[in-house]
Structure formats: structure tokens, C-alpha cells
A protein has these predicted regions:
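Active-site neighborhood of HAD-like aspartate-dependent phosphohydrolases
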Residues: 1-20
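Short, acidic loop-to-helix structural element flanking the phosphoryl-transfer center
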Residues: 13-17, 23-55, 63-66
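Conserved phosphate-coupling serine/threonine residues in phosphotransfer and NTP-handling enzymes
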Residues: 58
Length: 152
């Protein structure tokens, strides 16, 4: 929702309910209801078909990974398991481009940083971050700025 303006989820939930939240996120039926962002499937599919090597990097909590990845591969069947990296240290990866909606995941690295616009990151105003609003915009940025080669 638009009223969530921070990544600190604990400020939006009742005390002692964090475990309940993670329990919900661990459930397969929760992930059966998740839909990709508008244009995400099409943009990633086009980039893969154009010849780019795409890697998905997630900093998700380990408890949610099995159910989340099962959902992900259902929605993005053209992405292979070896194209998924699970790490909270995204800045350590040797990347060309990183797309994230959490600005903390884009700090302290040399790759191009695309900040996907969300209510939770409206406060961010950094010169080295390019704010993007749609997956079509992301697709065009990569096509315009990178010859076909590995893009992470």
C-alpha cells in the first residue's frame, strides 16, 4: 500500500507478530496468489531472448526462499535455477546493472543502480541512483546502455 513509506516492516506490524508474518510468507498458498509486477515477465523475457544473461538476486529471509522460488519459477519459466543468487550482500557481486526497490541494496557498489519507484523509497534522492517507474523503462535503459553481453 501507498502508506508504507519505509523498509522497516516492524513499524507497521503489532509487537510480537513478526513470526506470524514470516509464517504466512513461508506458506505455498500465499505465493500462489502473488502476481508479477506489470511488464516484468515481458521485459525479462525480451532481455533473455535478446541475448542478455539475466540473474535474479534476492535478499529474502531464508524461511521464505523455498516457497518464493517455486512461485518465481512458475511465473518466470525462462529463468533457470542457476540464474538465481540468494544474498544480502548484493554490493559484493560483479554486476553491470542492479534493479531494486530497496535503496540499501544499491549502496556501495560500482554497477548502474536502478531504483524501482515505490512508496517505501520516496525519501531517496541520490545522484548515483536512477529512479525507474516501469519494466518497459528498465528494458529500454539496458538496451540503450549495454551492448548484448552479460547483464546482472
Amino acid at each position: 500500500p501507498d502508506d508504507i513509506t519505509s523498509w522497516n516492516i516492524e513499524q507497521y506490524i503489532l509487537p510480537n507478530t513478526k513470526e506470524i508474518l514470516f509464517y504466512i510468507l513461508e506458506q505455498k498458498d500465499f505465493w500462489d496468489t502473488v502476481q508479477p509486477m506489470n511488464g516484468a515477465v515481458e521485459a525479462l523475457y525480451r532481455l533473455v531472448n535478446d541475448g542478455y544473461n539475466i540473474y535474479i538476486v534476492t535478499a529474502s529471509d531464508y524461511r521464505t526462499i523455498p516457497a518464493k522460488l517455486k512461485c518465481f519459477f512458475r511465473l518466470f519459466p525462462f529463468i533457470r535455477q542457476d540464474q538465481v543468487v540468494v544474498t544480502k550482500e548484493k554490493q559484493l557481486l560483479d554486476l553491470d546493472v542492479m534493479i531494486d526497490d530497496n535503496p540499501e541494496n544499491l549502496c556501495h557498489a560500482s554497477y548502474d543502480k536502478l531504483l524501482f519507484d515505490r512508496p517505501s523509497n520516496q525519501w531517496v534522492d541520490k545522484e548515483d541512483l536512477k529512479r525507474v517507474y516501469t519494466w518497459a523503462e528498465i528494458y529500454q535503459f539496458i538496451k540503450d546502455n549495454y551492448p548484448i553481453r552479460t547483464v546482472y
